């Protein structure tokens, strides 16, 4: 596929009311790389609910990043088309061959995990374990399809009103053992990135998702990521050299088994971490143990 190095005015899709067969509603996210809108099929009434989201390239993105933005959009589309699992967001439509480039997914009625952590006064331990286990199920489904997520972070965990998790953020994903191009300017992502990912010769590996999920679980319990660096270089140094504060010290209500699991997941050497299957099995076991536990985690 020949990728354009810049977007024409006709491809600056954030100014359009209609893209392909989709009518755009309100913009819900405006990021450096992409804009995301509520959407509905243009064949239905303009007053119909916008039960879908459409993701398009930010028209203000510098021309030298357009090819990479299309590649990332394609990675997300290919991953969410192939991974059929209830905790992975589904692809409904996409255009990757010509402008305007886009993908369409269901609208999840609920909130992301990062919003939940910032707004809720507390979270029940049993519900938290349910959310974490579902997230792990989504990541494992990617692994079973030969794909490493490489973008695990609380903003990519959507929690529907029923409590069902939908894992998004697959634009960072790579095939297992594929050389990666992880962006070097994403500070938020770097807070959860495994130390080996910073190497120039890094190839995508499931062990990196083990670390990132461990970092996210740490954040859920400690209300902050394992490391507080203010630059990517600071975070790289921390991931490579520093040991995070003990979870039990920060959050005394954390189950001992969960704190121990997270500690193992955050081991610097990827070969010494538990396998993702071992992580998931332990999360399931902990979830069952605390299924009726009334403990509330203060947020």
Task: Report each predicted region and the residues it spans.
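Structural helix C-cap motif within protein kinase domains
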Residues: 222-226
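AlphaC helix of the eukaryotic protein kinase fold
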Residues: 63-82
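Activation-segment/catalytic-loop signature of the eukaryotic protein kinase fold
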Residues: 94
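Activation segment signature within eukaryotic-like protein kinase domains
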Residues: 131-132
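Conserved short submotifs of the Hanks-type protein kinase catalytic core
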Residues: 98-112, 116
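Protein kinase catalytic-loop region centered on the HRD/HxD motif
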Residues: 137-147
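Conserved activation segment of eukaryotic-like protein kinases, specifically the C-terminal portion
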Residues: 183-196
